[in-house]
Amino acid sequence: MAFCGPRTAARLSHSTRALHYTHRSFASPRTLNEVVIASAARTPIGSFQGTLSSLPATKLGSIAIKAAVERAGIPADEVKEVYMGNVLQAGQGQAPSRQATLGAGLAISTPTTTINKVCASGMKSVMLAAQSLMCGHQQVMVAGGMESMSNVPYCMSRGATPYGGVKLEDIIVKDGLTDVYNKFHMGNCAENTAKKLSISREEQDGFAITSYTRSKAAWDSGLIANEIAPVTIAQKGKPDIIVQEDEEYKRVDFSKFPKLKTVFQKDNGTVTAANSSTLNDGAAALVLMTAEAANRLNVTPLARIVAFADAAVDPIDFPIAPAYAIPKLLSEAGLKKEDIAMWEINEAFSVVVLANIKMLDIDPARVNVNGGAVSLGHPIGMSGARIVGHMAHALRKGQFGIAGICNGGGGASAVLIEKL
């Protein structure tokens, strides 16, 4: 065993004091910073193999990020970090969020991280950025989500090619829409929830029709247009195409709703193509900053982030997971459900929203008042960021809004904001 003399001990004591000082100099602030949403922008949502299908998710992400930064009215180099949700990353190349960030014209020195929490990816990006800002690690960040389901490839397992041909798997289904624990489509989980909570097909069809009518009314009134970052698509030898409106909500024939066969459960099933969300392309981005940074940069924020929470349940019960995350929010904020003016619960399936309305006992008239993913579309990496951004635009001053979204594996994320 080694012993040290007085001089060595003195040097060690001095070094210890220096290390202690260094540690303290990098400590988090004693009080958390207030975080505000400076801007929120999104691309239109394109139908599967539709108007936006020529653009990869990273390009759509660049368009959303660039628009959000411009609308915040700040120099691009003020953004110090970017988080972007993206689920179906196969074939996109390294670091999709980095591609989207540099494509938006942000500084080469901007660190980026791609977030995958399945359908909650875009919302989790907002939550993680808010945490970084609250702790004082950064002052200005961009967070959002992006997906181009039209460009997702097929895959083949590595190894010897078997006799009789090869088997290709659809990455949309394999990595995005399959419950890996029960080895079936997420729609089977939706059927399970419908059965448990006695939610009929008629209720789900009725909800879907309401989603379409609300989306159309919101677009007709001009309410959604201020969220949109138009997408320009170059054409060879022809004028460019400018896409500035969601594509999916206009592609509906209500007369077919009661005639459609159920998709996931043939006997006594309730979930159909009409009362489920669709495969889509799009991106959304929000500029988040501390209240101090907003003052310094003369930014008038849209809203402030009050609280956020995650929850997890049995994977088969993923549709009801928001009903476990949302009470955490209300408790943390000291609010009651009656204090919430607007609810955005992502419409992965109509039964998801109906189940959460039932479990939370909330007013359906305040839920998804301008439509949702069943009618607008569900680019899975984008949707969580889209509903937070939509609330930041749609709420009135002083109102509170909650956005919740379920995700595969039995998870959910939720965010509470206040309009400023």
Swiss-Prot record:
GO terms for molecular function: acetyl-CoA C-acetyltransferase activity; metal ion binding. Its EC number is 2.3.1.9. CoA binds at residues 212, 251-253, 256, 277. SUPFAM superfamilies: Thiolase-like. Belongs to the thiolase-like superfamily. Thiolase family. Residues 1-33 form a transit peptide. Its main location: mitochondrion. This is Acetyl-CoA acetyltransferase B, mitochondrial. This is one of the enzymes that catalyzes the last step of the mitochondrial beta-oxidation pathway, an aerobic process breaking down fatty acids into acetyl-CoA. Using free coenzyme A/CoA, catalyzes the thiolytic cleavage of medium- to long-chain 3-oxoacyl-CoAs into acetyl-CoA and a fatty acyl-CoA shortened by two carbon atoms. The activity of the enzyme is reversible and it can also catalyze the condensation of two acetyl-CoA molecules into acetoacetyl-CoA. Thereby, it plays a major role in ketone body metabolism. GO terms for cellular component: mitochondrion. Keywords: Acyltransferase, Fatty acid metabolism, Lipid metabolism, Metal-binding, Mitochondrion, Potassium, Transferase, Transit peptide. It catalyses: 2 acetyl-CoA = acetoacetyl-CoA + CoA; propanoyl-CoA + acetyl-CoA = 2-methyl-3-oxobutanoyl-CoA + CoA. K(+) binds at residues 212, 273-274, 374. The record marks 378 as: Increases nucleophilicity of active site Cys. It is an enzyme of class 2 (transferase). One of its GO terms (biological process) is fatty acid beta-oxidation. Homotetramer. Pathway: Lipid metabolism; fatty acid beta-oxidation. PROSITE patterns: THIOLASE_1 (PS00098), THIOLASE_2 (PS00737), THIOLASE_3 (PS00099). InterPro entries: Thiolase, Thiolase-like, Thiolase_acyl_enz_int_AS, Thiolase_AS, Thiolase_C, Thiolase_CS, Thiolase_N. It is found in: Mitochondrion. The active site is at residues 119, 406. It comes from the Eukaryota. The keyword Transit peptide applies.
